[in-house]
């Protein structure tokens, strides 16, 4: 873990020179925990071992969340690893997606990933305990568990994702959503359609902004602090989308629709959910019906978490 501590002290930024960061791994190769190839006779036993490790890792994430209100950044970690997927590229891992590539410095310095080094620092100690759990899996497990522990729906997850081997396999910058594009609706569709997601899934996934805050020093958006964030929990400051920003519910849609509180954040890509006719159908529904939102969100989150993933075994590993 010495490499992690050294990086945290030094810091990473979008301005860091890529030649010195390209291919940078946050842990040593010995800690990678990549599963060796197994014969058919031992595959079932190996899968059973991995399942047990995944269950233990999930419990560790739950314990982390009890002591550290880091739900939002863990959700973001899983999303940003998976959200680089391009359905038009068939070759793995060039297609991007949930493949653990976000652990490399060359991808961490993408502007959209600013601040995610802190999330890696939270999950790497858990990952390092379980040799059979990949980075791709721990990122998605942490994300789904954070949603559930914040009061959200149970996500129908599967595991067994393969990791990319090095930073040379990271996706190019620019595949993740921006907060203030010239045409918000067009931008959201360009990004999410590239992943193979629908208008309904765009709106449902946007509802995860019920968790967390925007910080101007990271994204350029949000107030330095508000009455909802000035005292934490966790590090104080930033501007949240909802008043209870560690609780997963449908309040994001209610607040975006009403826009009555200046202390709550509304990005252009939030506002457009009630401005675009196709998006509005779903946003209105979710503002009125939390159960419908939870059902659609769980399905969309699971779909996102599988994008671009290569599973071993091919059908994945369920913990339910």
Swiss-Prot record:
Chain segments carrying region Disordered: 213-241
Cofactor note (record): Binds 1 heme b (iron(II)-protoporphyrin IX) group.
Known cofactor(s): heme b
Compartments it resides in: Plastid, Chloroplast stroma
Primary residence: plastid
Example of a GO biological process term: hydrogen peroxide catabolic process
Listed EC numbers: 1.11.1.11
Induction notes from the record: Down-regulated by hydrogen peroxide in leaves.
Catalytic activity of the protein: L-ascorbate + H2O2 = L-dehydroascorbate + 2 H2O
Tissues of expression: Expressed in leaves, stems and flowers.
Segment annotated as transit peptide: 1-42
Compositionally biased residues, Basic and acidic residues: 214-228
Source superkingdom: Eukaryota
Gene Ontology terms: cellular component: chloroplast stroma
Function noted in UniProt: Plays a key role in hydrogen peroxide removal.
Designated name of the protein: Probable L-ascorbate peroxidase 5, chloroplastic
């Amino acid at each position: 873990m010495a490499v992690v501590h050294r990086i945290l002290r030094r810091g990473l930024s979008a301005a860091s020179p890529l030649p010195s960061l390209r291919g940078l791994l946050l842990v040593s190769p010995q800690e990678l925990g990549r599963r060796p190839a197994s014969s058919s006779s031992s595959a079932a036993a190996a899968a059973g071992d991995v399942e047990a490790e995944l269950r233990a890792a999930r419990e560790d994430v739950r314990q982390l969340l009890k002591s550290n209100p880091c739900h939002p950044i863990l959700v973001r970690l899983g999303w940003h690893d998976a959200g680089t997927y391009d359905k038009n590229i068939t070759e793995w891992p060039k297609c991007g997606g949930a493949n653990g590539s976000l652990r490399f410095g060359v991808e961490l310095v993408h502007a959209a990933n600013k601040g995610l080094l802190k999330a890696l620092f939270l999950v790497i100690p858990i990952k390092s305990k379980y040799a059979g759990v990949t980075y791709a899996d721990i990122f998605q497990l942490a994300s789904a568990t954070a949603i559930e522990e914040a009061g959200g729906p149970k996500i129908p997850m599967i595991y067994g994702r393969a990791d990319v081997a090095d930073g040379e396999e990271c996706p190019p910058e620019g595949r993740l959503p921006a907060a203030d594009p010239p045409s918000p609706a067009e931008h959201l569709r360009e990004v999410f359609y590239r992943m193979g997601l629908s208008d309904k899934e765009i709106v449902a996934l946007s509802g995860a902004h019920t968790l967390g805050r925007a910080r101007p020093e990271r994204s350029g958006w949000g107030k330095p602090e508000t009455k909802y964030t000035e005292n934490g929990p966790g590090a104080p400051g930033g501007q949240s989308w909802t008043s209870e920003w560690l609780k997963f519910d449908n309040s994001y849609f209610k607040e975006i629709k009403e826009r009555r509180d200046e202390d709550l954040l509304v990005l252009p890509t939030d506002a457009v959910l009630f401005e675009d006719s196709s998006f509005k159908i779903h946003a209105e529904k979710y503002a009125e019906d939390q159960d419908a939102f939870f059902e659609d969100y769980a399905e969309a989150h699971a779909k996102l978490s599988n994008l671009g993933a290569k599973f071993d075994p091919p059908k994945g590993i369920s913990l339910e």
